[in-house]
UniProtKB/Swiss-Prot annotation:
Descriptive protein name: ATP-dependent DNA helicase chl1
GO MF annotation: an example: ATP hydrolysis activity
Catalytic activity annotation: Couples ATP hydrolysis with the unwinding of duplex DNA at the replication fork by translocating in the 5'-3' direction. This creates two antiparallel DNA single strands (ssDNA). The leading ssDNA polymer is the template for DNA polymerase III holoenzyme which synthesizes a continuous strand; ATP + H2O = ADP + phosphate + H(+)
Location of the motif DEAH box: 502-505
Gene: chl1
Compositionally skewed regions (Basic and acidic residues) per UniProt: 228-242, 253-268
Protein's organism: Neurospora crassa (strain ATCC 24698 / 74-OR23-1A / CBS 708.71 / DSM 1257 / FGSC 987)
Lineage, broadest ranks: Eukaryota, Fungi, Dikarya, Ascomycota, Pezizomycotina
NCBIfam families the UniProt entry points to: rad3
EC primary class: isomerase
Domain Helicase ATP-binding: 31-556
Amino acid sequence: MASTLPIPDINVIAPSFIQRDSQNSDNMKPPPTDFNHPYTPYPIQTAFMQTLYSVLDRTVAVSPPTTTNSTNNTAPSATFSSTAATLIPSNPSTSPSTPPLINPTTAPTVHLADRATEPSLSVTPRTTTSKDKDKGPSSSSSVPKGHAQIALFESPTGTGKSLSLICGSLTWLRNHKRLQFDSEIEKIQQQMEASGEPEWMVESAIKRKREELAQKYEEMERTLERIRQKEREMEKEGEEGQARGGKRRKLDRGKGDEEKGGKKKESGGSRGLTASDEDKEFLIGDWRDEGGLDENDPMGQLSKETRELLEKVGMGTAGGKKEANEGPVAEEEIKIFYTSRTHSQLTQFIQELRRPEFPASVPTPNPQEKPAKEIVKQIPLSSRQKLCINPTVNKLGTLAAINERCQSLQQPKTPKDQRCPYLPNAANLKATHEFRDTALATLPDIEDLYQTGKQLQICPYYASRAAIPGAEVITLPYPLLLQKSAREALGIRLEGNIVIIDEAHNIMDAVSNVHAAEIKYTDLKRAKLSLGMYYQRFHQKLTGENKVMVAQLQRVVEALGVYLKTKLDKAALGLKADQEGIVLDTSLLLKTGGADQINLYKLIRYVQESKLAFKIEGYISYCEEEGRDTDDEEAETEIKARQGRPPVLHTLCSFLTALTNLSSEGRIFYEKIPPPRGELQDMKLSYMLLSPTHAFSSIAESARAVILAGGTMSPFEDYKAHLFPDVPPEKITTLSCGHVIPPDNLCVWTLGSIAPNPKVDTGIGEDCFDFTFAKRSNPNMINRLGLVLLNLCSVVPDGVVAFFPSYGYLEEVIGVWKTHEQAMGPKTIWERLESKKALFIDSKTESSEQTLQKYSDVIHSEVRPLSPAGSRVKGAMLLSVIGGKMSEGINFSDRLGRCVVVVGMPYPNPHSPEWLARREYLEANFIKRYTASQQTSTATAPLPAPVIPPPSNTTHYSTNPSSSRNKDKHKPANVRKLAARDSHQFYENATLRAVNQSIGRAIRHQNDYAAIVLIDNRFEKEHVRAKLPGWIREGWDETQRQAKEDGKALKGLQGMMGRVNMFFRGKN
């Protein structure tokens, strides 16, 4: 029987969840109890950090209690099977299907995987030839087996999630480094003792080795400390403005850049050109010259001298030379790659990273000395759009244009005096090293990095790579991590490293979005005109092969344009099938002019390597600035109309790239789109990734651990089924934390009808709230909804935020409320609401920042504002949209969000082509995997879960196909039914995640309080509530318990108002 190692009691009794094999206890160490947290952590934070530590350390662990509300804090007994290397709970039948929950007053429940086996991380790269490039990617659809340990963490906002991630992961990393150090010393000691050397020689050798290992570390720390001291002195003297903890610097990237950077010759100017100069600037050269790009070499566009220098200073690709790197910070060790959705979230994370202090990676030579502290070495990575300091390049605006221009300035054929002066070179090598050391010494964010680059006159985008080998934490936005090509361009290798994805509730959509592409008919018209103008000017000077390739691109543009024009003409006739749909046969897209015979892989490679898009866009821009006349009236119109629009050929190239990467996981759609004011109707083609599985597999297969964390991650099943379908269940850990607020700070109510016992009519109770797509437009129900909000506004102080399924439906609801109904009295619902609170609407067309500011000003105003009728109102109500601008990234803490109301569930349109295509894919994939699992004695991959919607009286159910009650479900017809249910579950889960994100806008810290009201009869179904965050479910249970004790009605408007009124009375 395994021995139990309990978690220390911190204000609560927490069960043990880490167990060691008594026969091999030396190799199985429990997580520490001290995580260098800047303040005494909550018990849930301790459990979070210990779980994270164990995942990274691959510690063997078991599943503790399966119920979250039990008062019994004793851990269940477990047995360890050394043969199978798995831990078996004493009662496996009670294992929950929903993620475990931790809260401050109940026992933590953790599912930890077996950590006994260390996977192999070796990767054998495939050599790609130029012929391979022209043929395109392999058609193999198999997903590589994942090596990473996987952990899914849910921790509500305000519970210290960021600090828990920081302290848990960096404590493990520093301990890991110290163990490596000790291992080296122990190795020397064993070698010396085995050789029979005298004890004094053994001690001397160990001392020399210890000093040798510590020397490089000490040199680096001294260098970084000198930089930090210099930074402190500069801040004190006011040379850097306000101190680091103060207001962020606002960077002027406009004319000021040109003035501040004026001491260097700016590259890229090309106005007032002669015909000869135009040829040099815009004419395509021989794209197969030695300067041509290798798509597997992200630095292939740079000159030979530049590549050699970047590799020398550690800024080459992952496989580049590093042994020549100067300075003490070149060796690469295990790193933590942290990513989040926005740069502001990354900045907030870096601010949190500055708070804790961690022990040094190398122990002090004298055991009596106080352990040394070591600053965390972090480097933020970003795109050229955020980091470029060359004013002639960053003024281009769009990322594609900036990338093309930057690469163009570094081509081998570009004269040296026209290359970017900020790129690292032999002349500014000292500045490059100073940039690297400054970055590692100061925990910078993106704005700090940009400012440092400007001060040192060195490119932050390239110079930041020099800091990667010495960094412990690398922060970067979603696109740079999720796209394999972006990682390769930055020289990032995930093999053996730790990946932490924060705000991961939308990670599946994020993966799909970074691989999406679209192009409009108007874009194709612009591309055709641009190509025509360019060809007319330069066709006599183009080489034969260049003429062929440009002509091929023209044919492709013409074919795509004809396809969309045909659809647009049919759509004008009112045919519904031609308004939107799926392109079932993609060969039809290029049918015109024989474009379907063109090798698109080769054409795209040509466009990328020849810089054709940049040269054409540059020439059109030049004609615009010069006011040059053309013989083509349409071309003149194109020149005038292109201002402020993204470069069309970059858009085209992105779409063609998606077109060549078609697989079973992607589809092409066409859709008629509403035109901007004053313009003609338009039609677009779009590529959508139906599943993120294959695109995400390159991360899951290589990292040491992949951590998905968020405030509202529930339900968890989809992450397992669609991101990690081939990862064994024992390698996946899930943890759901409760909130830090006391139970009486939260009131949760589900309102399915306005009456306690709704009357029943034909299919729907006449008092029920049914916001399904087919029934939500019922004006009587919309008015009943208005009455509910009117009652809430009467008792809720300060701010009320109501979320609706869509902007369109919000407009519809407001329209009904503004319509006078005789039965509702002399005033409309809208007028009555205005008499209670100031009303604000989240609109697609208005700035969310301005709306939020006005809403906040009213709530915090000392003088109660006047309503349109002249009466004084108390507080304000904001009408917003689930998944809209106000539902994510904005905090309605304290008075701004005393009540959050969710109206309906934002299911997508069930008849949209995108939904139909994804449903078809999910069901086909389910059947394929289900069939494969039945054809072998052991399933080749875990089935997506959940499979069958649970019964109404339970949240836990079995998906075991061998169950006697499911004998007939292997029949094809029944399997199809299971597949349909599975696809429905996917969309229900996605819908609930969006709802959960909106709910999470309230309750932002320990002392905050709010009421949460969910209005729709579907919220009263237990299997729907089971997909809400654990702390919301517990809040609902507590509210129901209190209502019973008070003897109030348990359902309907009366029951809700009684409970909500009582809740806020207790807060006054």
